[in-house]
A protein has these predicted regions:
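Flexible, polar/acidic helix-loop-strand segments at domain edges
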Residues: 32-115, 119
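Structural recognition of the beta-strand scaffold that forms the well-ordered cores
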Residues: 24-27, 75-76, 150-152
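Second-shell loop/turn segments in exported
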Residues: 1-3, 19-24, 80-89, 105-110, ...
Length: 185
């Protein structure tokens, strides 16, 4: 797993994007989310769907505004049902949470590379990356992390014989690639 999984993912994404090289990757084990959420002081969300995890004592109700504690954040990100296309709901929760997380972490670091380094040191054991720390910090501060900088590959989820399958809308993907790589510059 770990590094090999990341390298395979990079190759698959590059292939999907017509051979465009992927400059780097950062992946984190979910157990690191407890630490990140704590460093961020929690993340406030409007709960997108009911999420329960009795083992963690989590019972979130759709529509409530909630500052997620560490266990709630973990459950909110991991929760999934067996319903068709449930992965899409999970992705929506992940995007929502990540936007709030990076807002909070950026506010805590406030351009202070030493504070960012301390945060990184606390989660380093959970991270797999081929990117140098200073570049990660620089890119996150420069790039920002909001809904305008997140793209969803267009396509359709269909039920196969045993599992859901996602079929990419190649024309729509091409449009996004053109928008991101050419219109942004």
């Amino acid at each position: 797993g770990l590094r090999n999984s990341c390298q395979r993912t990079v190759q698959t994404v590059s292939d999907l994007f017509g051979g465009i090289p992927i400059a780097g990757y950062v992946a984190m084990n979910m157990d690191g989310m407890y630490i990140l959420n704590s460093l961020a002081g929690g993340v406030e969300v409007e709960v997108l769907e009911d999420v329960t995890n009795p083992e963690l004592g989590v019972n979130l109700k759709k529509g409530e505004k909630k500052l997620l504690n560490d266990q709630e954040a973990y459950a909110y990100l991991r929760y999934r049902t067996k319903e068709f296309a449930a992965a899409n709901l999970r992705l929506d929760r992940e995007k929502q949470y990540l936007i709030g997380l990076f807002e909070n972490l950026n506010a805590k670091a406030a351009g202070d590379e030493k504070a960012a380094m301390n945060m990184y040191d606390m989660v380093e054991d959970y991270i797999v990356t081929n990117v140098q720390f200073d570049r990660i910090v620089e890119d996150l501060m420069e790039y920002g992390f909001d809904e305008n900088n997140m793209y969803e590959i267009p396509g359709e989820t269909m039920m196969g014989k045993n599992f859901e399958q996602f079929f990419v809308d190649k024309e729509g993907l091409h449009d996004i690639i053109m928008q991101v790589l050419y219109e942004s510059f």
